[in-house]
Amino acid sequence: MSEPARLISPEKRGEDLDMTLRPQSLDEFTGQAEARANLKVFIEAAKNRGEALDHVLFVGPPGLGKTTLAQIMAKELGVNFRSTSGPVIAKAGDLAALLTNLEERDVLFIDEIHRLNPAVEEILYPAMEDFQLDLIIGEGPAARSVKIDLSKFTLVAATTRLGLLTTPLRDRFGIPVRLSFYTVEELELIVRRGARLMNLPMTEEGAREIARRARGTPRIAGRLLRRVRDFAEVARAEAVTREIADEALTRLLVDNVGFDQLDKRYLNMIAVNFGGGPVGIETIAAGLSEPRDAIEDIIEPYMIQQGFIQRTPRGRVLTAIAWKHLGMQPPKEMEAAQFRLFQEDD
């Protein structure tokens, strides 16, 4: 799979874990204004009552700040922060070890909770609801149930695929928070803040050029900023201008809306091979030699949000925006066909 090597992948990489660029408080955090305002209220109320914050579920595409917000919440609550991910918790004993080491009101963050083992998920229910572990010790006739009391903790979980969560698990989160893609203006503020922390002189136009190509995602904005800095330093530029940012990102094959070669292959395949669609996701995955999950989680969310493609009952369809971006004319019958298709959708 080619996706991990992509510069504009929103998935985590080692360089993205640099804490110096991350905001340390809700006031420093840029974007997600409604979510931040609500979290401030919930955190303040929990602190005033001396109680553990209710369990929180963050939902949204990768790279929007779910992990950062969880860390900030623990910091503002004045408690310890523990972090893991769904695939790492392979068996009930792994979860038990995590939960029994938590202190009162601590925050446990589970990323990719939709990938949690179903057997482990069953153990999590009483832990979240009653702060108890109900474990089966031994096997066969000698097996017995053991209840272990836990400190009252806050589970903060993150998922990119809300539909993959079971209803019993989803219903146990008292505070659901949906995160959305960032505006160019918000990303520009994030880029300028990152440049200041790097001691990197940058013009407003330079910051905006990076923000425009960051796919609405702070993690990608930070990565593009680091790569543009490399080009600027080697060129011995006094500051990152729009021209320097444009040249660097163009050389890195990131176009003016943040699409790379894989995105263009996706759009071109639908346009050229299937006349603009509709075409099913499995056909697209086979044509690109990419897993379906990667297409649905990584490639498509930003395209859909920006109006480049439509999902219909019969498959993906290119919009007029996509045809214009490709520099192609849609088939003459496309407009009438799409009109009928979306009527069926209604």
Swiss-Prot record:
It is found in: Cytoplasm. Has 3 domains, the large (RuvB-L) and small ATPase (RuvB-S) domains and the C-terminal head (RuvB-H) domain. The head domain binds DNA, while the ATPase domains jointly bind ATP, ADP or are empty depending on the state of the subunit in the translocation cycle. During a single DNA translocation step the structure of each domain remains the same, but their relative positions change. This is Holliday junction branch migration complex subunit RuvB. One of its GO terms (biological process) is DNA repair. GO terms for molecular function: ATP binding; ATP hydrolysis activity; four-way junction DNA binding; four-way junction helicase activity. PANTHER family: HOLLIDAY JUNCTION BRANCH MIGRATION COMPLEX SUBUNIT RUVB, PTHR42848. DNA binds at R292, R311, R316. It comes from Rhizobium etli (strain CIAT 652). Coiled coil: none annotated. NCBIfam families: PRK00080.1, ruvB. Residues 1-182 are annotated as: Large ATPase domain (RuvB-L). SMART domains: AAA. The RuvA-RuvB-RuvC complex processes Holliday junction (HJ) DNA during genetic recombination and DNA repair, while the RuvA-RuvB complex plays an important role in the rescue of blocked DNA replication forks via replication fork reversal (RFR). RuvA specifically binds to HJ cruciform DNA, conferring on it an open structure. The RuvB hexamer acts as an ATP-dependent pump, pulling dsDNA into and through the RuvAB complex. RuvB forms 2 homohexamers on either side of HJ DNA bound by 1 or 2 RuvA tetramers; 4 subunits per hexamer contact DNA at a time. SUPFAM superfamilies: P-loop containing nucleoside triphosphate hydrolases, Winged helix' DNA-binding domain. It comes from the Bacteria.
